[in-house]
Each structure stands twice: as C-alpha cells, then as structure tokens.
C-alpha cells in the first residue's frame, strides 16, 4: 500500500486482499475499512489466545494513540472523535470520558500515570510534541511490563524491536531537521537491543550508521535512512523500519 501510486491503486490492492469495493474519491472509506479489518482481527485473536496479555501488547498502542488525540483535542477545544481508534484495551469512548474527567484510576497498566504526566506537560508547555514523547515513553514501558509478565522471550524481543525502530526513526528525523544531539537525547527510548548512547553518537558521526546497524535486522532500514538524509525517500525509510519489525513478527510461526 505504501508503494501505491494513486488512491485508485490503493483501492484495487485492497479489493485483491478481500476488501469490498471502495470509492477512491473517498479515502475516509478506505481508512474505515482498514480500521474495521484490524478490529475484527484483534477480536478474533483475543478470542483464541490462551492468555489475553499476548494480545494486549499489540492493543495497548491504540490506547496511547487515543490518549494523545484526546489530550490534544482538549487543549485546543475540538473533538477527537475522528482520530480515535477503537482497538485498544479500553473502548475509545471510555478512555475519552476518563481523560476528560480526570478519573484515571480505572484505566489499565501504566495509562493513569502516563495520561496524568502527559497532561501536566501539555498544560505547562503547550507543546503537543513533548506530551507525545511522554506518552510514547510510558507506552514502551507498559509494553515491556506486559511482555515480562507473560514470560515470553519472543514478546520481549518484539518490544525491543519496536523501540529500536522508534530510535532509528528519531535519529533520521532529527538529522533531517538539522537538530543537534541534545534534541535527540530527549526523544530516545531505553529498552531496545541498540543502546541509546550508540544511537546518540550517530548524531555527530552519521558515517557510523552501517557499523551500528549493519549486523542487525535494521540494516536495510539504516541504508534507506542514510539515503533519506541525502534527499532520498523518507517513505522508503519508514517502510524499511516497518518491514524489520514485521520480519521479526513473522518468526512467531516458529514459536511453539
């Protein structure tokens, strides 16, 4: 889908994958169809999983996405409805009510502390990027805790891969924006296989990208990132990051 050259091509690809005919002139229909498919998939997986926490680790990112949308909408006095995705551990409408009322204690995992801190940062700084970083940091911490409780080494590795992808994205975006290492240090996350210090060092010496990432699953993503820094496609870089995480998940079929 990322490589599709037009909305019409996206619509055709979706139909080939079993989606109903979609009007390319109405991209909101495509978004709705994709969201519905994801909701149905997560529901099916939840019903068949021996431990719901195996699925929670994939659902909780939607809780944090919704929290971001709700907080930012409240800050500017608009409705977050069109941005909400009902695929998290908490129904979107319930999360909206909890965040707007400040009654957070009933939320699962680290969400109460995460929302409270992000709201405080947003109220103080009026900078939604900073509040998003707070929520992302809590999200990866939440994911790591869920993985740890399940005892699944595979899920621990999945969380680490997600963090490594996020840190590589942060590095390339920081360099493209011409920001310095101080900025990058504030947006890197702990918990990946690649230490934040190693990523931070690349802010001053990007020639080390191949050395840091060459022997990892992110080798191709790093190559695409280096190309993006020279005027290449950022979309291709993002796709390579996603592919690296997807390749890791593909190994799940080998887990007994």
State what each model feature region is:
Residues 1-256:
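Extended alpha-helical surfaces
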């Amino acid at each position: 889908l990322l490589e599709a050259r037009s909305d019409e091509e996206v619509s055709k690809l979706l139909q080939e994958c079993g989606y109903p005919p979609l009007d390319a002139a109405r991209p909101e229909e495509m978004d709705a169809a994709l969201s519905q498919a994801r909701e149905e998939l997560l529901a099916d997986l939840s019903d068949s999983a021996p431990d719901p926490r195996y699925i929670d680790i994939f659902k909780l990112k939607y809780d944090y996405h919704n929290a971001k949308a709700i907080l930012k909408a409240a800050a500017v006095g608009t409705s977050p409805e069109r941005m909400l995705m009902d695929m998290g551990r908490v129904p979107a409408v319930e999360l909206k009510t909890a965040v707007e009322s400040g009654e957070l204690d009933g939320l699962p995992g680290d969400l109460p502390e995460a929302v409270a801190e992000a709201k405080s940062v947003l109220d103080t700084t009026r900078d939604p990027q900073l509040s998003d970083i707070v929520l992302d940091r809590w999200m990866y911490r939440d994911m790591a805790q869920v993985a740890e409780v399940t005892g699944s080494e595979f899920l621990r590795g999945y969380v680490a891969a997600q963090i490594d992808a996020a840190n590589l994205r942060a590095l390339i975006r920081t360099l493209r924006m011409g920001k310095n290492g101080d900025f990058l240090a504030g947006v890197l996350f702990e918990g990946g296989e690649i230490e934040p210090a190693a990523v931070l060092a690349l802010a001053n010496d990007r020639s080390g990208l191949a050395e840091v990432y060459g022997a990892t699953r992110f080798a191709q993503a790093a190559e695409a990132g280096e190309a993006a820094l020279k005027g290449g496609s950022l979309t291709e870089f993002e796709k390579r990051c996603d592919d690296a995480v997807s390749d890791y998940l593909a190994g799940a079929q080998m887990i007994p």
